[in-house]
From Swiss-Prot:
Binds 1 zinc ion. The lineage of its organism: Bacteria, Bacillati, Bacillota, Bacilli, Bacillales. Belongs to the SprT family. Residues 6-144 form the SprT-like domain. Keywords: Cytoplasm, Metal-binding, Zinc. The active site is at E68. GO terms for cellular component: cytoplasm. This is Protein SprT-like. It is found in: Cytoplasm. Its cofactor is Zn(2+).
Length: 154
């Protein structure tokens, strides 16, 4: 899906569910990692995570667009547009928009280190300075072994 198709889809959803036009820009943002989308308060644009569309399809994307359009229309009307506001929660229920999107992070990278003396393995999310840190069991030197990618269950 291109940004132009996304713009048309957003305008269509806005008219169908909110009976109001969407007059700003909707676009994909590849830098979004942990969120499905965001509404920009200053420019009134909507940015969406393209990975959500690639992984979960058009239905999930439509749900995220509805969620962001709730923020958009409530903000423009001067009503409560934040997640905790009553107006926002009512609009989510009325339009069938999800409160949360499916997780954007399906993969997790784990670094594996091993002790050169006792062969104990360490699994870490962050890099270890092997010049500074040693094995907790025998105080031997640590050596980088490999990088694993773990897939989370759905």
């Amino acid at each position: 899906m291109t940004n132009k198709e996304l713009q048309q889809l957003t305008e269509t959803i806005s008219l169908a569910f909110f009976k109001r036009p969407f007059t700003h820009t909707a676009r994909f943002n590849n830098r979004l990692r942990t969120t499905g989308g965001r509404y920009l308060l200053k420019s009134h644009d909507i940015e969406l995570n393209p990975k959500q569309y690639e992984r979960y399809g058009k239905e999930e994307l439509i749900g995220i667009i509805k969620h962001e359009l709730c923020h958009y229309h409530l903000h423009l009307e001067g009503k409560g547009y934040k997640h905790g506001d009553k107006d926002f929660q009512e609009w989510l229920a009325k339009t069938g928009a999800p409160r949360y999107c499916k997780t954007a992070q399906d993969e997790q990278t784990v670094l594996v280190y091993t002790c050169t003396s006792c062969s104990r393995t360490y699994h870490r999310r962050r890099k270890i300075n092997t010049q500074k840190y040693v094995c907790g069991t025998c105080h031997g030197k640590l050596k980088f072994l490999s990088k694993k990618v773990l897939h989370q269950r759905k």
